[in-house]
């Protein structure tokens, strides 16, 4: 009976219900109608954001919209994390969770600021300042049209007040994967 609720050791630690949910997801995701609906929903969000002047990466993807945070907040220097400032602004404004993809995620800490490095060789790659994005991922089977419209309204409000956003300074960062648990303070 335990196998039915907790799964078997060969299930990779997943309960039977979780495996069933994954199987259902795999079944649904290959239906053409569903894919067209999903892609269109993301396109809709992108079109609405563009229509109010919010800069995004084009064309929209199939699962997310990427806001160009450097263009959204040109008054915030890269070293003060404009993407994270937008992420915090969206959360404070409307409870919308997003993720920064840029100098915070790909920076390497104070010893090697704002650059990409290969983890094993330490070879330096392109500067992270090329990427200052905010990802608005759209989970499957969760949001309706009105939810997407809410995101547009909140992002529009924040964009109109973007001059109020301030840069951030890291006050704590772990040695690895700093974007998950770093702590910040707003700059004056």
Predicted feature residues:
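Active-site loop ensemble at the mouth of alpha/beta enzyme cores that anchors a bound cofactor
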Residues: 70-98, 112-129
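PLP-dependent enzyme catalytic core of the Aspartate aminotransferase-like
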Residues: 29, 93, 105, 111-188
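Generic non-transmembrane alpha-helical segments
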Residues: 44, 48-52, 85-96, 152-161
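A broad, low-specificity signal marking well-ordered, structured residues that form hydrophobic/aromatic
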Residues: 63, 96, 134
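Active-site C-terminal subdomain of aminotransferase-like
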Residues: 1-83, 88, 104
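Residues in well-ordered beta-strands of folded domains
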Residues: 66, 99, 137
